[in-house]
Amino acid sequence: MSRKCEICGKGPSFGNNVSHANNKTRTTWYPNLQKVKAVRNGSVQTIKVCTRCIRSGHVTKAI
């Protein structure tokens, strides 16, 4: 299971946590993915979508 949005392709980003003492430790930030039942190609499928795509209306939710 990949941590990637199936609509826009947004995935994890990498960087450093930096303390006040300027110590750096590697970290990973993951997108806010939700499992949504959506209509794709005329059928209902469960897909993982980021909240940005849900809010902007790129996903047609199944009722």
From Swiss-Prot:
Protein name (record):
Large ribosomal subunit protein bL28
Gene transcribed to yield this protein: rpmB
According to its UniProt entry, the protein's GO biological process terms are: translation
Instruction: Report the HAMAP family cross-referenced here.
Output: Ribosomal_bL28
One GO CC term on file: ribosome
Q: Does the keyword Ribosomal protein apply?
A: yes
Similarity comment: family membership: Belongs to the bacterial ribosomal protein bL28 family.
Q: GO MF annotations for this entry? A: structural constituent of ribosome
- Species source reads Geobacter metallireducens (strain ATCC 53774 / DSM 7210 / GS-15)
Q: Cite the source lineage.
A: Bacteria, Pseudomonadati, Thermodesulfobacteriota, Desulfuromonadia, Geobacterales
Instruction: List the InterPro entries.
Output: Bacterial_rp_bL28, Ribosomal_bL28, Ribosomal_bL28/bL31-like_sf, Ribosomal_bL28_bact-type, Ribosomal_bL28_sf
SUPFAM superfamilies xref list: L28p-like
- Give the keywords, sorted: Ribonucleoprotein, Ribosomal protein
